From Swiss-Prot:
Alphabetically ordered keywords of this record: ATP-binding, Cytoplasm, Kinase, Magnesium, Metal-binding, Nucleotide metabolism, Nucleotide-binding, Phosphoprotein, Transferase
InterPro entries (UniProt xref): NDK-like_dom, NDK-like_dom_sf, Nucleoside_diP_kinase
Domain of life: Bacteria
Intracellular or extracellular location(s): Cytoplasm
Name of the protein this chain belongs to: Nucleoside diphosphate kinase
Active-site residues, as the UniProt record annotates them: 117 (pros-phosphohistidine intermediate)
UniProt source species: Tolumonas auensis (strain DSM 9187 / NBRC 110442 / TA 4)
Annotated positions binding ATP: 11, 59, 87, 93, 104, 114
Catalytic activity, reaction form: a 2'-deoxyribonucleoside 5'-diphosphate + ATP = a 2'-deoxyribonucleoside 5'-triphosphate + ADP; a ribonucleoside 5'-diphosphate + ATP = a ribonucleoside 5'-triphosphate + ADP
GN (gene name): ndk
PROSITE patterns for this protein: NDPK_LIKE
SMART domains with a match to the protein in the record: NDK (SM00562)
Amino acid sequence: MTIERTFSIIKPDAVAKNIIGEIYHRFECAGLHIIAAKMLHLSQEQAAGFYAEHKGKPFYDNLLKFMTSGPIVVQVLEGQDAIRRHRELLGSTDPEKAQAGTIRADHAISVTQNAVHGSDSSESAAREIEFFFTEDEICPRTR
């Protein structure tokens, strides 16, 4: 198994519900180390840059409106098979299809307001991490 990094966002709906600690607890119990984290309020420009791949899709405008509606928490997670393990914790993007016990099954309201985001590949993880963090802001905990 490979030690890898993944990127995660706790979205405005989950921040508003005050469940950041619960989500972090799930990450840590799954063996994922939080090696960088920050809370911020995305600007329209930041949201458009981060979600550029979705521009032109029917949900794009609502996604930007939602992601700029309140603070988010972004973090880099590190651990064995971090991308796969993180996505398993999150559950399906659609909370109605998410397996019981996953973060989205427990806390999401809709496909957009689904509590969390997670990278779906090592390429996405690298791009998303670089969007929010400099290398100096990342503190590896596993070797």
